[in-house]
């Protein structure tokens, strides 16, 4: 990773995802701006202040709790499309013995809902929150 690369690597820690590494690649600014607008519409918030408040979890709150709080009351179809868009920017190193050997994410690579929540949370913190 260089100074201009905002990719983030996250270690899978839950169940069948334990030992896998997930890398969230940098998203181009135009795509990120469009994503943020779609996100605000899908989660039916009045504005970015509400999003910031939802994405600032209380101390000791689990990542999945924050994600589920964020998704409560959302347009399910729009939210699914946003999640699939997020996952286009995720790569996986599925073998713990080769933690740096990343490849494109496949549908069956994420086995645990908590891992999906961690990935979505990391994506929002590193790509969405700095943009708003």
For every predicted segment, state its role.
Residues 28-132:
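Short, surface-exposed, charged amphipathic helix/loop patches that serve as local interaction elements
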Residues 1-15:
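Short acidic, Pro/Gly- and aromatic-enriched capping/linker segments at domain boundaries
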Residues 6-10, 24, 86, 123:
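Generic structural hydrophobic/aromatic packing signal, biased to beta-strands
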Residues 21, 25-28:
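Short, proline-centered helix/strand-breaking motifs
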Residues 16-20:
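Short acidic/polar mixed-charge low-complexity motifs
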């Amino acid at each position: 990773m260089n100074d201009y690369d905002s990719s983030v690597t996250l270690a899978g820690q839950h169940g069948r995802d334990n030992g896998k590494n997930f890398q969230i690649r940098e998203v181009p600014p135009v795509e990120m701006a469009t994503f943020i607008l779609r996100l605000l519409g899908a989660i039916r918030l009045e504005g970015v202040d509400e999003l910031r408040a939802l994405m600032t979890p209380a101390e000791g709150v689990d990542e999945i709790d924050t994600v589920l709080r964020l998704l409560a009351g959302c347009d399910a179809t729009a939210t699914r499309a946003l999640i699939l868009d997020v996952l286009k920017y995720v790569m996986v190193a599925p073998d713990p013995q080769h933690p740096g050997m990343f490849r494109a994410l496949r549908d069956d690579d994420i086995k645990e809902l908590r891992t999906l929540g961690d990935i979505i949370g990391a994506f929002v913190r590193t790509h969405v929150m700095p943009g708003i």
